[in-house]
């Protein structure tokens, strides 16, 4: 069932299968940390990261431990960031980082221009870049048809990563 806005009509069509192929890289996941609202520097999501030149000469904190975090952190370093501190939540990426880069355990809070990590590390920072993934967002589906899962490489209840186990005629592509 859908609305034809041009003709202001409600229409209903029947299909054997429905494929949801909208992907999930449009609504960034923005975690909340104490002190974020009062942080005097820049906070952005990797979704909006365009040019590492902006961070030349600055202390940058990158939060995340997957491909985007690695890419953003290395770009910031390459383009002259004063320091790059990567905060991970579960496991460090574990690379031998160049001088001026390090990994530390989980951001606890921001206090002024300082990032305080759970392992006790304190880092002055000018910018925080969130490489924290994306939310699944399906505003066009009714609640009973929406895939409800956190940001995961292999969402549960998707057989072979595509066929929804709650309704085998609903196929999700690009959710990983």
Model-derived features: positions:
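Flavin (primarily FAD) cofactor-binding/catalytic cores of flavoenzymes
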Residues: 1-176
């Amino acid at each position: 069932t859908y609305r034809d806005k041009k003709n202001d009509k409600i229409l209903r069509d029947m299909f054997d299968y429905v494929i949801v192929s909208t992907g999930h890289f449009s609504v960034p996941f923005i975690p909340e940390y104490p002190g974020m609202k009062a942080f005097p520097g820049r906070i952005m999501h990797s979704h909006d990261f365009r040019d590492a030149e902006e961070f030349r000469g600055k202390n940058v904190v990158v939060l995340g431990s997957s491909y985007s975090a690695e890419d953003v952190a290395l770009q910031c370093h390459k383009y002259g960031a004063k320091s790059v501190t990567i905060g991970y939540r579960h496991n460090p990426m574990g690379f031998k980082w160049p001088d001026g880069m390090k990994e530390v355990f989980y951001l606890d809070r921001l206090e002024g221009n300082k990032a305080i990590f759970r392992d006790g590390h304190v880092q002055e920072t000018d910018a925080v870049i969130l490489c924290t993934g994306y939310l699944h967002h399906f505003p066009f589906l009714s609640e009973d048809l929406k895939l409800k899962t956190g940001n995961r490489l292999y969402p549960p209840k998707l057989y072979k990563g595509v066929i929804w186990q709650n309704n085998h005629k609903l196929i999700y592509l690009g959710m990983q």
